[in-house]
Amino acid sequence: MSNLHELKCEACHIDAPKVTDLELEEMLQGISQWRVIERDGIKQLEREFTFKNFKLAWAFSNKIAELAEAEFHHPTITLEWGKVTVCWWSHSAKGLHKNDFICAAKTDRCLE
């Protein structure tokens, strides 16, 4: 699914459906540089971004924070010298929801 960045997140509740394995594979094709990890039994999308210095990494982190506020969906952002790691997952669903893939695709667009 290559148009994920054009979609808008929907309200996610505790009973929101997690993506199926088939949906996961399909949506991963649109965000090929992301990987699925499992932390504390919860699937998450993770990607590391590298930069030439801390200031560029910091600026990118701020763009992700603005994206998160606009979508009302919030990731874990780890800022280091020359590197930002972003993890998306749906806290209320305790796993991966379509919102996570939408935000991952929009995160990739923040590099442009």
Swiss-Prot record:
Pfam families: Pterin_4a. It catalyses: (4aS,6R)-4a-hydroxy-L-erythro-5,6,7,8-tetrahydrobiopterin = (6R)-L-erythro-6,7-dihydrobiopterin + H2O. The lineage of its organism: Bacteria, Pseudomonadati, Pseudomonadota, Gammaproteobacteria, Vibrionales. This is Putative pterin-4-alpha-carbinolamine dehydratase. HAMAP family: Pterin_4_alpha (MF_00434). GO terms for molecular function: 4-alpha-hydroxytetrahydrobiopterin dehydratase activity. The keyword Lyase applies. Belongs to the pterin-4-alpha-carbinolamine dehydratase family. Its EC number is 4.2.1.96. InterPro entries: PCD_sf, Pterin-4-alpha-carb_dehyd, Pterin_deHydtase. SUPFAM superfamilies: PCD-like. One of its GO terms (biological process) is tetrahydrobiopterin biosynthetic process. It comes from the Bacteria. It comes from Photobacterium profundum (strain SS9).
